[in-house]
């Protein structure tokens, strides 16, 4: 799958789940489950409830995503 196939959306962290998973509410109101990308995990980026994040979704499964950026 090419990198350009991903859909990027803004969202807010609603809840922290086990195994670095998060429940994220997107701007359009949908709620998805997202995990942290490898570079964020490697650099110990902390994500807390209420943080604004950028989530990448694949066209194949719009209920799961990957957190790629945390806004300050």
Swiss-Prot record:
Localization: Cytoplasm
SMART domains the UniProt entry points to: S1 (SM00316)
GO CC terms: cytosol
Gene3D superfamilies for the chain: Nucleic acid-binding proteins
Pfam families: eIF-1a
Matching SUPFAM superfamilies: Nucleic acid-binding proteins (SSF50249)
Origin superkingdom: Bacteria
GO molecular function, one term: rRNA binding
Keyword entries, A-Z: Cytoplasm, Initiation factor, Protein biosynthesis, RNA-binding, rRNA-binding
InterPro entries the record matches: NA-bd_OB-fold (IPR012340), RNA-binding_domain_S1_IF1 (IPR006196), S1_domain (IPR003029), TIF_IF1 (IPR004368)
Domain S1-like: 1-72
Record-stated family: Belongs to the IF-1 family.
Biological function: One of the essential components for the initiation of protein synthesis. Stabilizes the binding of IF-2 and IF-3 on the 30S subunit to which N-formylmethionyl-tRNA(fMet) subsequently binds. Helps modulate mRNA selection, yielding the 30S pre-initiation complex (PIC). Upon addition of the 50S ribosomal subunit IF-1, IF-2 and IF-3 are released leaving the mature 70S translation initiation complex.
UniProt xrefs under NCBIfam families: infA
HAMAP family in UniProt: IF_1 (MF_00075)
Assembly notes: Component of the 30S ribosomal translation pre-initiation complex which assembles on the 30S ribosome in the order IF-2 and IF-3, IF-1 and N-formylmethionyl-tRNA(fMet); mRNA recruitment can occur at any time during PIC assembly.
Protein name (database record): Translation initiation factor IF-1
Record lineage: Bacteria, Pseudomonadati, Pseudomonadota, Gammaproteobacteria, Alteromonadales
């Amino acid at each position: 799958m090419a990198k350009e196939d991903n859909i990027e959306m803004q969202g807010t962290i609603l809840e922290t789940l086990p195994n670095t998973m998060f429940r994220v509410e997107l701007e359009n109101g949908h709620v998805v489950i997202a995990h942290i990308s490898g570079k964020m995990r490697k650099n110990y980026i902390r994500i807390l409830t209420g943080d604004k994040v950028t989530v990448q979704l694949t066209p194949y499964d719009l209920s799961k995503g990957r957190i790629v950026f945390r806004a300050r």
